[in-house]
């Protein structure tokens, strides 16, 4: 075979390789390691989920998800740069590469998962949409919300669920839309709307910002399923795995009774499941491209799922969301939280 033929087939193979889009390049994990921080898209301020205090320090369930990934990859949960995003802009900012992950009380749906080139990595909070009204209105059920003005944030499943619910129940309403949740809440609080709607956890969070929280009540109906969780780009399987298993580790740790407070004393255990979780046996970090202390770092620095929940949204917080009896309890205690085996 002539040299020209070899050159032809060699060029053809290279051309096909380039067209396939499989050109080797650094992944998100490598980018994060190089810059020394995780860029995380969060909300513009939802207490209990992602909210900055007066000093600029961020906290919340979604914030702790970002911190868990940073602990896994960089060994330091504090190496996170937060970027507040509107519901409308969040997906485009993630797709463009401006952030490494999105952890912003975002609902997992078919169209988002399959149609945006993005991947939901799991559910860190199971929620459902509801309504908040003034007690003075003396409305005790959403079925009586007819001919009302409803404040709502654009670019959300909330808008779609609102439309479906009122149509299905033959009720009339006028949507008053805003690009920021805080604007929608402020408008409702100022009396521009009769109702404000979002996920029920969000209603509890936003009520704490109102002038007189005690004057408002959340109606009993839950009109949708809202599995909320972090999102990454769909072209990096390793990064998706890291984000997913960072969540699973927190759930698994709680089930095994391992917390940020007792984790070091657990090193002397004979339980093989705990030994693997803490990196004392096996090589669970290898397949993720991480050190074998990746899970230990998450639990030690961020906590198990129960710790994260109670600290941010639990019964003793301003949100007061009791965990028992909710889907956000471990499967062994009546909830639906379940982590695949860490082995």
Predicted regions: what they are:
Residues 280-343:
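C-terminal functional modules
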Residues 64-67, 71-73, 136-139, 143, ...:
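Extended ligand-binding regions for polar small-molecule ligands
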Residues 19-26:
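Sec/Tat signal peptide C-region and signal peptidase I cleavage site
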Residues 26-27, 33-103, 288-290, 301, ...:
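Extracytoplasmic small-molecule ligand-binding "clamshell" domains
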Residues 67, 71, 75, 79-144, ...:
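Acidic, polar ligand-binding/catalytic clefts
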Residues 1-12:
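Bacterial N-terminal signal peptides that target proteins for export
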Residues 39-48, 58-73, 107, 127-183:
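Bilobed "Venus flytrap"/periplasmic-binding protein-like clamshell domains
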Residues 80-92, 175-190:
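Short helix-initiation/N-cap motifs at beta->coil->alpha
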């Amino acid at each position: 075979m002539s040299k020209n033929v070899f050159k032809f087939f060699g060029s053809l193979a290279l051309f096909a390789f380039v067209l396939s889009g499989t050109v080797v390049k650094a992944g998100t994990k490598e980018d994060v390691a190089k810059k020394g921080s995780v860029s995380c898209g969060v909300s513009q301020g939802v207490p209990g989920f992602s909210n900055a205090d007066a000093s600029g320090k961020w906290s919340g369930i979604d914030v702790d998800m970002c911190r868990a990934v940073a602990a896994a990859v960089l060994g330091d949960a504090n190496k996170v740069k937060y970027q507040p995003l509107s519901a409308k802009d969040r997906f485009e900012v993630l797709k463009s590469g401006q952030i490494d992950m999105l952890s912003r009380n975002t609902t997992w749906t078919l169209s988002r998962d399959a149609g945006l080139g993005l991947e939901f990595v799991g559910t860190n909070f199971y929620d459902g949409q509801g309504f908040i009204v003034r007690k003075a209105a003396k409305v005790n059920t959403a079925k009586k919300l007819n001919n009302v003005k409803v404040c709502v944030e654009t670019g959300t499943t909330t808008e779609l669920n609102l439309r479906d619910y009122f149509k299905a129940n033959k009720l009339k309403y006028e949507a008053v839309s805003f690009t920021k949740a805080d604007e929608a809440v402020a408008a409702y609080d100022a009396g521009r709307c009769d109702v404000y709607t979002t996920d029920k956890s969000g209603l509890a969070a936003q009520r704490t910002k109102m002038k007189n929280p005690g004057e408002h009540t959340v109606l009993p109906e839950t009109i949708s399923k809202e599995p909320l969780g972090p999102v990454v780009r769909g072209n990096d399987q390793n990064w998706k795995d890291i984000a997913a298993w960072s969540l699973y580790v927190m759930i698994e740790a709680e089930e095994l009774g391992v917390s940020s407070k007792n984790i070091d004393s657990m090193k002397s255990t004979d339980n093989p499941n705990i030994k693997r979780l803490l990196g004392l046996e096996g090589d669970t970090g290898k397949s993720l491209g991480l050190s074998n202390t990746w899970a230990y770092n998450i639990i030690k620095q961020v906590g198990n799922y129960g710790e994260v929940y109670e600290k941010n949204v639990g019964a003793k917080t301003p949100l007061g969301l009791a965990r028992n009896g909710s889907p956000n309890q471990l499967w062994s205690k009546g909830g639906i939280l379940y982590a695949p085996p860490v082995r």
